[in-house]
């Protein structure tokens, strides 16, 4: 059954393809730079995704938060680890980040490995 995360991923893939096919070199270069920033270096990709989630939350970018939550699930972060990172984002970002943390929790419901335990 499709969910909001599936819809987000489809929309993102479709629009990224359109953007990258528009022929603008600057846009292509920026997308490449953004992608390469998460390649392993002194920090591994897994850590960089968690940093991306924190930065996205502080900056209050819901699409970015969703993307990094999906990636955090893919690279093996556990729900409690992601919640701990969201706590850091909340402390850095302040109370204005609360609605974005709330949406992050809602989004995690649809991500394998980040879903709440059913009790």
Which residue stretches match the model-derived regions?
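Acidic, glycine/proline-rich low-complexity segments that act as flexible tails and inter-domain linkers
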Residues: 1-49, 97-119
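Residues in soluble alpha-helical coiled-coils and helical-bundle/repeat scaffolds
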Residues: 38, 59-60, 77
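Short, thiol/selenol-centered motifs that function as redox-active sites or metal-ligating centers
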Residues: 51, 55-67
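Iron-sulfur (Fe-S) cluster-binding segments and ferredoxin-like electron-carrier domains
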Residues: 67-79, 105-108
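Membrane-interface alpha-helices at helix entry/exit sites of multi-pass transporters
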Residues: 82-85
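Glycine-rich phosphate/pyrophosphate-binding beta-alpha loops
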Residues: 91-96
